Amino acid sequence: MKFVDEVTIDVTAGNGGAGCASFRREKFIPFGGPDGGNGGHGGNIFVVGDRNLNTLIDFRYIRRYTARNGEAGRGSDQFGAAGEDIVLRVPVGTIITDTETGEKIAELLVHDEKILLAKGGDGGFGNLHYKTSTNRAPRQKTPGWPGEVKNLKLELRVLADVGLLGMPNAGKSTLIAAISNARPKIADYPFTTLHPNLGVVRVGPSQSFVVADIPGLIEGASEGAGLGHRFLRHLQRTRVLLHMIDMAPFDDNVDPVAQAKAIVKELKKYDPALYEKPRWLVLNKLDMVPVEQRAALVKDFVKRMRWKGPVFEISALTREGCQGLIHAIYSHVASLQEQPEEVPDPRFTTNEDLSEAAPAPDRDDPRFR
């Protein structure tokens, strides 16, 4: 299935039905009074988050959604039926924005969360509504109110705990296939990954985290080069980024340090907030480096990179070092999920000794007997 993570749609809620002006007409009842009912409410348009969806492709082919209008009121005190609502199902993690105002209408982060996108118009009043003790035969009625019309932008950002970052062919897809049940396409040419892939990593029976793999970045990605710039937004909800480095490039003229610095530069250009996220270095393909040269190669890389954060040495192909990386990631993610201790509100705290401010009651006082 084709991956689509951004679409624009038009939604039109239903108009309210018109009110009715009529009078009761029966034999032997010359002045039956008003009996015109109100119009029905126009149909609303809702959006619901669905964890079973992972693309917005359905909205690529159907871009206009119009709810039914409410029915008009009728005589004999009959109110019009409300228009049928429309419910749009989108992947969890979708952000919906009004293109005209720029206002963020909804951000669906929970399965089955339901949010109103466009409100249907209220039904008009029939003449029965205007009946009073002084106006017993009203003839006025009102039309229904129009429903809301909006042009909306739907943007999908995947929900993942960990994001994989790196140049093409750094081994990101190989890693996600090694540590999870995800099976992305893997090949020895650049840009094999064309869309984000998600994988669930099981650490224990009830312990897991989600990893997101996006297409590789190249220098100039923030200006539109390559594919990665289109998918960097999918890393904005992650808790930690794994910067994967190819330590054994095919071309001897390629400098892994220069490539790593280029990725960091592009990340900072694209989104400073994404640049500030916790980022770990994962030195991959060490199985292709002679054992006696590994320590010196890693030490030289870290020194030239001037890196102060965590460093992991792995081989995604042979899975060497992957278990240590998995447990480190889970410990980090679990620590962030713990709720912080409640901090008492300083407005309701005092440093005074309450034992002195409120002396103990006198036991001889008859009120306490």
Swiss-Prot record:
Monomer. CDD domains: Obg. The keyword Glycoprotein does not apply. Mg(2+) binds at residues 173, 193. InterPro entries: G_OBG, GTP-bd, GTP-bd_Obg/CgtA, GTP1-OBG_CS, GTP1_OBG_dom, GTP1_OBG_dom_sf, OBG_GTPase, P-loop_NTPase. An essential GTPase which binds GTP, GDP and possibly (p)ppGpp with moderate affinity, with high nucleotide exchange rates and a fairly low GTP hydrolysis rate. Plays a role in control of the cell cycle, stress response, ribosome biogenesis and in those bacteria that undergo differentiation, in morphogenesis control. Its cofactor is Mg(2+). Residues 339-369 are annotated as: Disordered. This is GTPase Obg. GTP binds at residues 166-173, 191-195, 213-216, 284-287, 315-317. GO terms for cellular component: cytoplasm. The lineage of its organism: Bacteria, Pseudomonadati, Pseudomonadota, Betaproteobacteria, Burkholderiales. GO terms for molecular function: GTP binding; GTPase activity; magnesium ion binding.
